[in-house]
Curated annotation (Swiss-Prot):
Role played: With S4 and S12 plays an important role in translational accuracy.
Protein name: Small ribosomal subunit protein uS5
Keywords on record: Ribonucleoprotein, Ribosomal protein, RNA-binding, rRNA-binding
GO biological process: translation
Family: Belongs to the universal ribosomal protein uS5 family.
Protein species of origin: Ignicoccus hospitalis (strain KIN4/I / DSM 18386 / JCM 14125)
Assembly information from the UniProt record: Part of the 30S ribosomal subunit. Contacts protein S4.
A GO-annotated cellular component: cytosolic small ribosomal subunit
Organism domain of life: Archaea
């Protein structure tokens, strides 16, 4: 549904985009490690061609102008490769197609890595199927706490949080939520913000990898 630009047609507008197009950067994780900003959605298309997406919410919004009330569609989209990358974006437009395109572009600009692990004391498989430690995220009145779960538990969460977790590659997790979780946007963003916390600090088992 989104309009993507092929590698040949893409003309980078930023320094990072030119570095990607010239082959100086070959992995999206290089951008995260070097703290380089993603200012063009085509950068993500170029480096992560296997991204999937899902529309989480569609709602009508109105804006009062001199010409009267203007009604537009507001779309919330989650993207991810189900292997440690996830993004969340919102787009507004009069037509569904363009609203989804804007939401996808914003989700790509917001894409973030997710550190996965086997953080539950009940599980010693060592596989990256859950979160490595307890993390929490907040958006508006909604707060989401993600706790490591043993293998086979599944995603113990609401439908909106499940979608965000699934696209991030999380397979087993316990969740605790507070606030008005019926607000899809805040629920999704709180879950997304919690996942971002997995990269805020290093666990002891990551120290050796960073040396």
């Amino acid at each position: 549904m989104a309009v993507t630009v092929s590698a040949e047609e893409w003309v980078p507008r930023t320094r990072v985009g030119r570095m990607v197009k010239e082959g100086k950067i070959t992995s999206i994780y290089e951008l995260f490690e070097k703290n380089l900003p993603i200012l063009e959605p085509e950068i993500v298309d170029y480096l992560v061609p296997d991204l999937k997406h899902e529309v989480l919410d569609v709602s009508l919004v109105q804006k009062v102008t001199d010409a009267g009330r203007v009604t537009r569609l507001r779309v919330l989209v989650v993207i991810g490769n189900e292997d440690g990358l996830v993004g969340l974006g919102m787009g507004k437009a009069k037509q569904m197609r363009f609203a989804i395109q804007k939401a996808l572009a914003n989700a790509k600009l917001n894409i973030t890595p997710v550190r996965r692990g086997c953080g539950s004391w009940e599980c010693t498989c060592g596989e990256p199927h859950s979160v490595p430690f307890t993390v929490r995220g907040k958006s508006g009145s909604v707060e989401v706490i993600l706790k490591p779960a043993p293998r086979g538990t599944g995603l113990v969460a609401g439908d909106v949080a499940k979608a965000v977790l699934r696209y991030a590659g999380i397979k087993d997790v316990w969740t605790h939520t507070e606030g008005e979780t019926r607000t899809t946007h805040n629920f999704a963003k709180a879950t997304f913000n919690a996942l971002k916390q997995t990269y805020k600090f290093l666990a002891p088992w990551d120290w050796v990898q960073q040396q």
